């Protein structure tokens, strides 16, 4: 379950940024999570809920943006929605696809409070 280590890394990163700015509390955390990122979204959410306990993020509002997968066929250049990493082009059937969106897994922003 690598989602727990990802959740812990998110908490460490955010707490480090809060500490560097002299903040005692993180009020808001905004995440972008792509459907093609390779994480189980529900498992990550559960792990994050567990990882924030006792941290500066414990009472933070967590905003999650889910990014749908999108790819472009390298053969016919059709842009199409992707449900899986190895989705074929719906136009020509090619598997030579460049992923345009959906692999994101990042902290987009944090809101901190100094006391």
From Swiss-Prot:
Keywords: Metal-binding, Nickel, Zinc. One of its GO terms (molecular function) is nickel cation binding. The gene is hypA. This is Hydrogenase maturation factor HypA. Belongs to the HypA/HybF family. It comes from Parabacteroides distasonis (strain ATCC 8503 / DSM 20701 / CIP 104284 / JCM 5825 / NCTC 11152). GO terms for biological process: protein maturation; protein modification process. Involved in the maturation of [NiFe] hydrogenases. Required for nickel insertion into the metal center of the hydrogenase. The keyword Ubl conjugation does not apply. InterPro entries: HypA/HybF (IPR000688). Zn(2+) binds at residues 73, 76, 89, 92. Ni(2+) binds at residue 2.
